Design a protein with these regions (language model features):
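Aromatic-lined carbohydrate-recognition surfaces of secreted/lumenal glycan-active proteins
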Residues: 98-116, 177-196
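C-terminal outer-membrane/trafficking sorting elements
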Residues: 850-898
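Aromatic-lined carbohydrate-binding/catalytic grooves of carbohydrate-active enzymes
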Residues: 38, 42, 46-159
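Glycan-recognition surfaces
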Residues: 129-132, 179-180, 184-274
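Carbohydrate-binding surface patches
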Residues: 262-265, 270-272, 308-350, 379, ...
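Extracytoplasmic
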Residues: 339, 348-353, 381-537, 658-846
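C-terminal beta-sandwich/jelly-roll accessory domains of carbohydrate-active enzymes
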Residues: 323-325, 331-408, 415, 866, ...
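Beta-rich interaction/scaffold domains
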Residues: 530-679
């Protein structure tokens, strides 16, 4: 334990650190295809567009500037890309008041030499040339920054299959830079994952994720990977979230989130677009002085997650003064729907009274008491400066904000016994520190615990473990005790409380177990004896949340029961124990209400389908029995007091519907159809892809395959024999989006097909529907979700499907009670893409019951699918007859086209 007890506390409160690097880098826009004119023009644009004045001063020449080595092993500057050498260009950059950056690799070869086909990069890496190259780059040429990749040191990414040790190589390069005598060189480690805590002693910044690409999914993923790394941005050393894609095609909200979250998380800000083509809107966003101030704040802190909120995240950090009365707050919504988000000032350690300023719009929003909330659009972020009347001592310290000396992302954490951070809904902040213990340095430590006056505190540790595990507690170097705990499950929170003494000022608390695995840690809570404010606040919050849920649509008895349960917990006795119990009960009640509402919605959809099928049936004994079951289900729900009734009633209706539709005594009306979708498992991919073979990718409530051959299938059993129509929304792109030239010329061949037993048909072409075909869709989709006028993402496909696009209608027959449905393609091209959703199945009868079109040749009619989606408006009778085979609704009547 000596290594833990001897740790010194960092006196952070009075220090100011270097800020994250700001500038421009060539890779995103140009790859290795760079030259002197490009770099010079970008440097000039930084100045002319005011970006230099905004703080962007580094001009970084990424991969592509070198061309092997000469006979003596010296680096050769690329003779055609930089015919005048690099020195005149660097001098021009310096003369413009800017700084110049360069690139290399920790191995022999650069990344572009392997992945980009740039053979000129072979042999230009630093390996075996560290000191010589450092003298050349930072002494002779005068570079001020270097990014060092690791393709040449990672066996699968270099032609030599050279495997090097990251720590050894990056440390050696750091030492070579220091040996030049330059102390102002900024050094970026690019290993595409957080390399380990050793890196803060080596580099200025380090990449913590894979390369960014132009797309919302990439931005969202990088933010997610950095949510729980706030403890590792320290002492002016930063987690690098990669270059900025702003101004290159994402939506305005996505660009704002991209820039705003990079600023909140104190990432380096390196513009990645072609500055000669950047628009004024992007320049204005990149130049926002109030967002830049967050990024360049002398405290050099990365915002940490305070709480998760319905799929969104709330982050906060100090600005201007450590533990001062002003904090920056980000409300981040990565979901595909707008949401109301807010925060109680108490939860961000601020007093009741506060002024709020919007940093995107750069305007004061006014004075608020107790809390603040606003609407945050899908993929959006809102960032505020909150200035309060007082600063409170922080009471809750989430484990995902704690530092772990063993943390790294290069090796399997279980193999090397290093801790990680994982999201778990039951945790107070929505995440936990896990896989802790079993080695000396695999522990969690909070190094910034502040006490205004010092003294005795109650420390409550929230933990998760399904087995007996030990925790050693160390406070300011003193071992307080060893505790054995068990919460009773790996998704159950347990807690234990002990008394500790804190000194006035900064303190450090460590939870460890060097000899064996310890429990996962949710958080620690610090309160003084008799301090009930935290527990009162949690209770008020839980009461407010429970009351805010709209119960008006629930059955009267059920809604009244919930109100009575809430009332019972609304006014507990003034003690820690009673507040905690009442809060726990209120949270359970709120969850029960939400489950009831979801179950009610599912029941409603199931009942609607059953009623439609009843209406499509001839009178019969089987129908009377079926209708009787539906009446019973409705009565069950109307008189329900407990939420379980909804699921019971849903199962009752589903079972009765399947029984009825399979009953030979049930008779379908001529010209009508039965909706048999209830026989398909997971037809709409609402939450995942269960029920389907083939493992398609799931997201945005749709399924997809990209860049590959595939088959997704399901066999539906228990069906009547007869005629059916399978409907599914699906699109296929044969190769990279070229605007649909082959589709328009009639030469496009789509290899992907929909199958229903012996029937098959090609999937609809991506190019069969333009985004502009729907004014609503055109208004809602932009940026990377659209390319050349067509949807270009899973979210885009979801929105197009919601607009009624890409229906594929396939008639088929069932002869043995079973129907195999599938989508497959046995060929693929680069960038081919298939996206699909919403399988529906309709039974047309044992015989062909098509209905003649009872309309005049001159009539203009609207055509719908059986589910009410408009296929087309203003069609003639001749045009309707040319529709693909299937079931449609015309003039309120179902018709079948063969």
């Amino acid at each position: 334990m000596t290594s833990l007890i001897s740790l010194a506390l960092l006196p952070l409160s009075s220090l100011a650190w270097d800020a994250p690097t700001m500038g421009w880098s060539s890779w995103n826009a140009f790859g290795h295809r760079i030259n002197e004119d490009i770099i010079r023009s970008q440097a000039d644009a930084l100045v002319s567009k005011g970006l230099k004045d905004a703080g962007y001063i580094y001009v970084n020449i990424d991969d592509g500037a070198w061309c092997g080595r000469d006979s003596e092993g010296h680096l050769v500057i690329h003779p055609t890309r930089f015919p005048n050498g690099l020195k005149p260009l660097i001098d021009h950059i310096h003369d413009s008041g800017l700084k110049a950056g360069t690139y290399s690799d920790a191995g022999h070869n650069t990344c572009a030499s392997f992945w980009g086909g740039d053979r000129d990069g072979i042999g230009t890496g630093l390996y075996e040339h560290d000191e010589e190259d450092a003298r050349f780059m930072f002494g002779e040429l005068g570079f001020d920054f270097i990014k060092v990749d690791f393709c040449g040191g990672d066996g699968p990414q270099n032609s030599e299959h050279l495997d090097l040790d990251e720590r050894e190589r990056y440390t050696a390069i750091s030492n070579a830079i220091k040996a030049t005598g330059r102390t102002d060189v900024r050094y970026n480690v690019c290993r595409w994952a957080y390399p380990g805590t050793w890196v803060e002693d080596v580099a200025t910044s380090w990449r913590m994720s894979q390369d960014i690409y132009l797309g919302w999914e990439s931005v969202k993923d990088i933010i997610h990977q950095n949510l729980y790394l706030s403890a590792y941005a320290t002492k002016g050393r930063f987690n690098d979230m990669d270059m900025l894609e702003i101004g290159r095609g994402m939506t305005d909200e996505e660009d704002k989130t991209h820039f705003g979250m990079w600023c909140m998380m104190s990432s380096p800000l390196l513009i990645g677009c072609d500055l000669r083509e950047i628009d004024d809107k992007a320049v204005a966003l990149l130049s926002n002085p109030e967002l830049i101030a967050l990024n360049q704040d002398p405290l050099a802190l990365q915002a940490y997650v305070v709480k998760r909120y319905n799929g969104g995240y709330i982050l906060v950090k100090d600005v201007d003064e450590l533990r001062g009365t002003t904090r920056a707050l980000a409300l981040y919504n990565p979901t595909d729907r707008a949401m109301n988000m807010g925060i109680d000032f108490f939860d961000i350690d601020l007093g009741e009274e506060a002024d709020v300023r919007d940093l995107f719009d750069r305007k004061d929003l006014g004075h608020f008491t107790g809390s603040f909330e606003t609407i945050v659009p899908a993929h959006g972020t809102r960032i505020f400066r909150i200035s309060a009347d007082r600063r409170l001592e922080r009471r809750v310290f989430e484990a995902e904000t704690a530092f772990n000396p063993s943390y790294q992302e290069l090796d399997n954490n279980q193999a090397v016994k290093s801790g990680i951070y994982e999201e778990l809904d039951v945790c107070s902040g929505g995440a936990k520190a896990s896989w802790l213990g079993s080695r000396e340095d695999n522990y969690v430590t909070w190094r910034d615990i502040w006490s205004n006056d010092g003294g005795e505190y109650e420390m409550t540790i929230n933990f998760i473990t399904g087995a007996d595990r030990n925790i050693t507690v160390i406070v300011n170097g003193e071992m307080i005790g060893n505790i054995t705990v068990n919460s009773g499950g790996w998704d159950v929170i347990g807690s234990t409380t002990l008394k500790i003494n804190l000194k006035k000022g900064e303190n450090e608390i460590i939870l460890s177990n060097p000899s064996d695995w310890m429990p996962d840690i949710d958080c620690i809570t610090l309160t003084r004896e008799g301090d009930l404010e935290l527990f009162r606040h949690r209770h008020r919050q839980a009461l407010r949340d429970a009351l805010a849920i709209d119960k008006s649509g629930l059955p009267e008895k059920m809604a009244r029961r919930f109100d009575e349960l809430i009332l019972l917990e609304s006014d507990p006795e003034d003690s820690k124990e009673t507040y905690e119990k009442a809060t726990e009960n209120l949270n359970k009640i709120a969850l029960e209400i939400q489950i009831a509402l979801d179950a009610q919605q599912t029941f409603g959809k199931t009942l609607d389908c059953a009623v439609r099928n009843s209406g499509a049936s001839e009178e019969s004994e089987a129908l009377a029995s079926f209708d009787g079951v539906l009446d019973e289900a409705v009565s069950m729900v109307a008189d329900a007091e407990l939420p379980d009734v909804f699921s019971d009633a849903t199962e009752k209706v589903q079972f009765a519907m399947k029984e009825y539709l399979s009953n030979e005594g049930a008779i379908l009306k001529k010209g009508s159809v039965w909706d048999m979708t209830c026989f398909i498992e997971n037809p709409d991919f609402d939450s995942d892809t269960h029920g389907w073979k083939g493992e398609p990718v799931w997201g945005s409530h749709v399924a997809e395959y990209w860049n590959r051959t595939f088959e997704v299938s399901q066999t539906v059993e228990g069906l009547r024999n007869g005629f059916y129509t399978l409907n599914v929304q699906a699109l296929y792109r044969v190769k990279a989006n070229d605007g649909g030239a082959a589709y328009r010329s009639g030469s496009e061949v789509i290899p992907a097909k929909i199958y229903a037993n012996d029937s098959s048909m090609p999937i609809s072409s991506l190019y069969s529907h333009k985004v502009s075909d729907s004014a609503l869709l055109e208004a809602e989709l932009s940026g990377t979700h659209v390319l050349n006028g067509y949807v270009n993402s899973m979210h885009g496909a979801e929105m197009a499907f919601n607009s009624g696009f890409y229906w594929n209608i396939l008639p088929t027959t069932v002869k043995d009670g079973a129907l195999r449905i599938a989508i497959s393609s046995d060929t693929s091209q680069a960038d081919c893409w298939c996206c699909f959703d919403n399988f529906t199945l309709y039974f047309q009868g044992a015989e062909d019951n098509a209905v003649d079109l009872n309309i005049d040749d001159s009539d203009k009619i609207d055509v719908y699918t059986p589910s009410g989606i408009c296929v087309s408006r203003g069609m003639t009778k001749a045009e309707v007859k040319q529709l693909p085979s299937g079931i449609y609704i015309v003039n309120g009547e179902k018709i079948i086209i063969r």
